[in-house]
Swiss-Prot record:
It comes from Bacillus subtilis (strain 168). This is Probable glucitol transport protein GutA. GO terms for biological process: carbohydrate transport; sodium ion transport; transmembrane transport. InterPro entries: MFS_2, MFS_dom, MFS_trans_sf, Na/Gal_symport, Na/Gal_symport_CS. One of its GO terms (cellular component) is plasma membrane. The chain crosses the membrane at residues 28-48, 50-70, 99-119, 126-146, 169-189, 200-220, 246-266, 283-303, 312-332, 335-355, 389-409, 426-446. It is a multi-pass membrane protein. GO terms for molecular function: symporter activity. The gene is gutA. The keyword Cell membrane applies. It is found in: Cell membrane.
Amino acid sequence: MIGTEKVTALKAKHQSKSSTGLSWFERIGYGFGDMSYNIIFQFVNAYLLFYYTDVGGIQPAVIATLFLVVRVLDAIFDPIMGLILDKTNTRWGKARPYLLWVAFPFALFTFLCFTTPHFGETGNMVYAYVTYILLGMSFSMQTIPVNSLTGRMTNSVEERTVLTTTRMILVYIGILLSISCATPLATAIGGEDQAFGFQMTALIYAAVSIVLNLFSFFTVRERIQPKKRKKQGIKKTLSVLFKNKPLLMLISSFLAFAIGFNIKLSTMVYYFTYNVNHKEFVFMGTVLFFGAALISNLFIPFFSEKWGRKQVMIITAALSLISYAGLHFTPYSSIPLIFIWLFASGFFTTPLNTLAWGMVADCVDYAEWKTGIRADGVVISSMSFINKLGVALAGSFSAIYLGIAGYVANTDQTVASLNAIKNMNALIPGFFILLSIILIAFYPLTEKRYKHIISELEQRSAR
């Protein structure tokens, strides 16, 4: 057995590197890395469906197939990217260099996705598939390394919560500005030419993402260096996913959240355009929803330390159900009440997202403790895969539901299509949030158990 003094010294040394070693400058720099991704990712999620139907004139059924095929292919790339990340070794670390390498391709493919060529109907569809697939691959090459950095910068539960919360506050600021400014920017730049307006808006966002990525690259550091072990085969590395009950419960819950959240996000513009009949309120609705998310994230570290992260997820998500039910029964003419429900849903729903991305780093340590294999990339990529699968299912569901309901762009909508849009902003997201609550209730990794796992890992490393 290792001596008590040696374990104590090892813990003290480790704490000095993880808990006290992160300055606010570095936390903010890390947040900028994820902010750069989400400015683009959420812009695409919120507006690409609308861009294709109302600007490109593509039928919803065609878009449904495009979204499902491209996003599933994109999601399949995530585990591959995870394996690539696990085999990456540079003088800058494993994950950090991707902030530099991917910054420019990521920006380029964003611009190309919102560029409509004149290749004819078939040529334009091929172009849409190719550019969207390339954008999705660059998404993976950006987000998987960024998310794995949490576990490489610190293994303190408290520090990870602060780090993830700081990151998510910046993410929600980015999303807030990205989504709320998109329509005004596109209108100001393009006027009646929406295609040009959205293209230039995408170019502006792409340029901002490059700056944020580079800032993040130059500010973050990888401190946690796991003990070197012999290389594992791909099959054995992937096996850590299926032996990891905390991860399986976390990603199942997150899938339900991602479907519900993205159904609402991608149809909010329809809700204000056709149901409320005030397209100009898209800006205010977005500000309230993501502004509320930003505010709620300020309280997450305090309540997570007091009650535990799983309990905070369950309580806040349960409270969010009231807002979805309230929105469903609110008349379209009651604008102030609609805004109140939007604020409440943003405030109480988004902690699910924030805490889940922090907890996945714990699942990496759990896998190492249980199997002896540390596979940051593979574990993190499973979360990214689920996120993209949720986006794919949400986008396809929304497009199919609009088609079935008889939606026709740029006309007065039927009662059936108005009800479909309302359902996708209220009852349907509420159902998936309820499912997410039920699944996360079975997440077995408590803060106390996690600290015990870290203690055992430290003792193993010292032997």
